Design a protein with these regions (language model features):
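Conserved P-loop NTPase/AAA+ ATPase motor core
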Residues: 36-184
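Conserved AAA+ ATPase core "coupling" helix
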Residues: 1-13, 19-29, 40
């Protein structure tokens, strides 16, 4: 956390930022990102501010840049889903969020969206940890698996079938389960 905060400070020293900017919160949310990702985030935030006609970067610019770097591309608002697909994606993402909220070992949900991204995601549920952790307990790992599978479960519960939208969730849940068996 301290290293990410220092990296963010180094890359933002020449960038004008307003009073809403909280680099501590950004450092906490960016666990797993490397220095070049953090530098890209600061640069993208500055570009966002300039595009919007502002001299100062604000927290919203930084969060938008975080999503671009960490989540997978820019919003692709011109990708038009059918009403049925939008409904499926909505239930899928809400499934993740509800299960996250009901578990005691999950990071809280910060954002849910069904706006497609340029990297392929039709929506996502963003969780941000409340504190930096270097180890995860079995209960925390099982909570992650449960959360990943909750989107698919919501699809089956509401629509009586699952879609290909859960493919990445299944990959992530499987990777955690495999690591639990073979590495921990």
């Amino acid at each position: 956390l301290k290293g990410r905060l220092e990296t963010l400070k180094v890359h933002s020293k020449d960038v004008l930022m307003d009073e809403t900017v909280d680099l501590d919160a950004l450092a906490l949310a960016t666990a797993g990102l490397v220095g070049s990702d953090l530098a890209n985030m600061i640069n993208e935030a500055a570009i966002n501010a300039v595009k919007k006609g502002r001299k100062y970067v604000n927290q919203a610019d930084l969060f938008e840049a975080f999503e671009l770097v960490a989540v997978g591309g820019k919003e692709k608002k011109d990708r038009v889903m059918s009403d049925k697909e939008r409904k499926i994606v909505s239930y899928h993402e809400v499934g993740h969020a509800i299960v996250t909220a009901l578990q005691t070992h999950s990071a809280p949900v910060q954002k849910i969206t069904i706006v497609p991204r340029t990297m392929g995601a039709l929506g996502y549920t963003l969780q941000t940890p409340e504190e930096e952790k270097f180890l995860q307990t079995k209960d925390e790992l099982l909570a992650k698996i449960t959360t990943y599978m909750a989107g698919r479960a919501a699809e089956v519960l509401v629509f009586s079938s699952a879609t290909s939208g859960a493919a990445n969730d299944i990959e992530n849940a499987t990777a955690i389960a495999r690591a639990m068996v073979t590495q921990y």
